[in-house]
Design a protein with these regions (language model features):
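Residue-level signal for the short linker/turn that defines the boundary of a DNA-recognition helix
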Residues: 7, 17-18, 44-47
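Short, charged recognition helix plus adjacent turn
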Residues: 64-71
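A short, Lys/Arg-rich alpha-helix, primarily the initiator
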Residues: 1-15
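DNA major-groove recognition helix of helix-turn-helix/homeodomain DNA-binding modules
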Residues: 47-62
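Short alpha-helical DNA-recognition segment
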Residues: 17-35
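Alpha-helical residues within the helix-turn-helix
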Residues: 14, 25, 54
Length: 71
């Protein structure tokens, strides 16, 4: 069994009316980083996940979760 990380980053960002660039600026990362995390291309470090949770004022587990994926 392979575990994949799912995220609600796009939904939480959109709920605030923020662009990827706005979230990136608030989190101190590039827009490309936000894009790759939202699209599941890049798994964020613990520090980045916690920083995003702080910026979005959500618990980290509300943004990221493990999901089973077919091996």
């Amino acid at each position: 069994m392979v575990e994949a990380l799912t995220n609600r980053l796009r939904e939480e960002r959109a709920a605030r009316g923020w662009t990827q660039a706005e979230l990136a600026d608030r989190a101190g990362v590039s827009r490309k980083t936000i894009n790759t995390v939202e699209n599941g291309v890049f798994v964020p470090s613990t520090i980045l996940a916690l920083r995003l949770a702080r910026v979005l004022e959500r618990p980290v587990e509300a943004l990221f979760a493990l999901a089973d994926a077919a091996a």
